[in-house]
Amino acid sequence: MKTKLIILGCGNSMGAPRIDGYWGNCDKKNKKNARTRCSAIILRGSNSILIDSSPDVRRQLLANNIKNISSVVYTHEHSDQTNGIFELRPFAFKKKGNKKVNFWRKGNPVNVYGNFSTIRLLKKRFDYCFKSFYGYPAIVKGNIIKKIFSLGNYDEKINFNTKQVTHGLIETTAYVFENTAYISDCNDLSIVNMKIFQNLKHLVIDCLRIKKSPVHFNLDEALYVHNCLKPKKTILTNLNSDLNYDFLLKRLPKNVLPAYDGLKLNL
């Protein structure tokens, strides 16, 4: 069965354009420079696994005609990865098997997964999503990930291997699945020595800007990681408005591609 990864959003925490209309170096005439906040989805049969619920997730799912979410895996607890969690509410109304769920009695909460810190902070910030609140049932159920775990049933199952990597002062979860690694927020150059990231078909990697950052890879660092790990293809994500799509495309090696919203990868 074929598996697909869609980059729903590839922008940094402010997106492009920013809310004040600032495009930076990005040419607004090129649609690939319009970037919503980082999020992605894995599709395999009826199994739809969302990676992060960005503040733009409603718009992202509608734009890509995604009508079901089976579960969500979170990379970390920052707002640009999590603030769309309430948008998961319609999926708690979905049928469970052949039975229609009575949402108002018990709901059918969406399973969300993350490391201990992420789930703990999500429950604190969005308590009304995780438990019954003023008569409204919970819409999500928190689960702490194991190093290796699977989501889905039978031939639609996706197997995950995970690694905690440094993102400034916190740890973020890098997910490896279907010979693909997704590392959207990271400044941990030690990943070049980690076996889990070797012999990949696709590497989706943080690349914030040209200048160095204390919490993200910049362009030179992302290319260093690519050259060390040697995946068949690297996709740069978490791009801020300094990085114009065509500027990157002309300067990158043939097997390195700047992400854009809606980019589809066959895994």
Describe the function of each predicted region.
Residues M1-I183, N187, V192, L249-L267:
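Binuclear metal-dependent hydrolase catalytic cores
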